Amino acid sequence: MAPRRLLLVGEGNFSFAAALSETLDQSTQLTATCLQRPAELARDPLAWENLQCLRERGIDVRFGVDCTQLADVFELHEREFDQIYFIFPHCGRKAGVAKNRELLAKFFQSCADVLAEEGEVHVALCRGQGGTPADKPQREWHNSWQVVAMAALGGLILSDVYPFSCKAVAGYKCTGYRSQDKSFHVEGALNHIFTRSLPFEGSQPRIFRIKLGNQWFSFPEPEALVGKLNRGFLEAPSCHPIKTINEKLIAELGKVFPLKRLKCSYPLLPQEGTSVLPFWNCDFLSAAFWISLHEDNSNSESLTGGTSQDVEDFLVSFSELSLLKNPGRDGKEEACEGTCGQAKICLRPSLLVHVQDVIEVPDFLSGSLHILSGPVFQKCHILPFTMPAFHETLFILGVNQNLKDGCLQSLLDHLKGILDSLLTQTLPESSKLSSLVKFVLQSNGKDYMIRVKTHNFSPDCTEDLIIGSVITSATSVIHKDQCFVFVSMNLDLLAMLVWCISDWRMLWTFDNRFLKNFVPGKIEPFKSHSLYPPCYVHDVSFWIDQKKGFDELEFHTVARAVSQDTIISIQFLSRFQHPKTQQVSLCYRLTYQTCDKALTQQQVASMQSQFRKEIQQHLYVIPR
């Protein structure tokens, strides 16, 4: 293993460097720096004593180092520091919060040039300066140093924070109060640890290629679903918590019911296939993502304008997919040739669309749980527990009419017990007194919604989450003596509840640190690698075209696409009607916040500007 490389910046009397050097093993390389020149430290006996100790230990000491220009100090071969420390940074004298924010911003940007890929930046701040909820008490945002927002300018996120203890660094003496040889209060001080964030990728969607017979077709990834297609969370090699919770659920039900797992690898549906689905909620269709397949005669290497992915097994059972036809010369339809061949399809909004295919096969096994699992996609409003893409498991049970009530009750009882067991594993014993799961009978008197209390997120959270549904059906055309029960489960919400993951977007992160939280065979509360990300708020108001109307669902979908899923809230503020023209204006408030990446105020301003352009173009509104 390569030796660790540590960098200390902004040292005053070098007492922190001297104390830290005593705790390090011989393989660790320490570089201690300060802004002052040696002559400026000549009047400080403690500084000279510490410098002498450092030199005796072979520590690299450098003077006149500006922590905001680290790339100018270290050659390329000297960089790649594993840890960079800045202990109680300040601009000196009576500098206000604005000056100290500027210092932090430039420091973090400078760190990005010399920090190792998996390195850490440690910044100790006095009580309240950081402006995060970890500070007790927490200062108002405008009166703090806004350390997390400043770190974002350097592409860094806050990954840990804990109390700074002088006792843990024996011999350290803080100094520099108002640029004097005076100490300052460090009670309640915090050490903030920052790590590199994944960068925001360009908004160019990936291009997917699929094969129909001998012909390749392509389509761009919907912008509102960037990073959501073809992730393979449920596939064999995956150790994703969504797969873990699905396997646990299936295994427990398998102790009571015989199981038959069905292959479900295609989330695309042909347009004509959506009209023959008796179990389809009409709301699904209005919220579906519709896309067009286009003939693609290029090879995958020659595609431009996006990342190409060949997904032969991923998308669709293409024997059911029909191309759009052109009228032939004899009045019959014939398929378009060349690049005019295309098909209108939608991304599957629910696994219920496959029910008909499953229950109508002649060899359907009565009394067995038939299981489908896969991703589904729906346009939706931007809300904390509503997601445009999630993984669903569908249990299909066919039973004799005479046994319906008993089998249904048995299934619900066992499912309730399994869910209660899973959902209470991360709760303290005092919270396990009552069931978290309720089956709420619907107005039709036969179907149920599966509701769960959300104590896992916060004791103050009183809203129940709907994590699934139970649908009972009449007999099928082929199996007239049977009735059917369909249990649909939102695996993403279930995983969030089990592991206390408060933000659904974290399940889709590309950051490898996410999966390191999950140990096989154990369920422990999730710890995010990005703490206290800052929020940025922007308002937008616009005149609507009253003839064309205003589609609020599409408004949310455009916001999701433009912001790359960084908008966490859209709040309707007001409606205004001009007294003379009768023209109507709407005003909304958008809140931006990421869960896993560094997001700057400048990036948000750019997104907001682009959002105004997009809604004008696609929703026929006139921004004010």
Swiss-Prot record:
MF (Gene Ontology): rRNA (uridine-N3-)-methyltransferase activity
GO term, biological process aspect, one: rRNA base methylation
Residue ranges of every copy of the FDX-ACB domain listed in the record: 531-624
Coiled-coil boundaries: none
Alphabetical list of InterPro entries matching this protein: aa-tRNA-synth_II/BPL/LPL (IPR045864), BMT5-like (IPR019446), Fdx_antiC-bd (IPR005121), Fdx_antiC-bd_sf (IPR036690)
Source taxon at top rank: Eukaryota
UniProt GO cellular component terms: cytoplasm
One Pfam family cited in the UniProt record for this chain: FDX-ACB
Full protein name: Ferredoxin-fold anticodon-binding domain-containing protein 1
Organism: Homo sapiens
Gene that this sequence comes from: FDXACB1
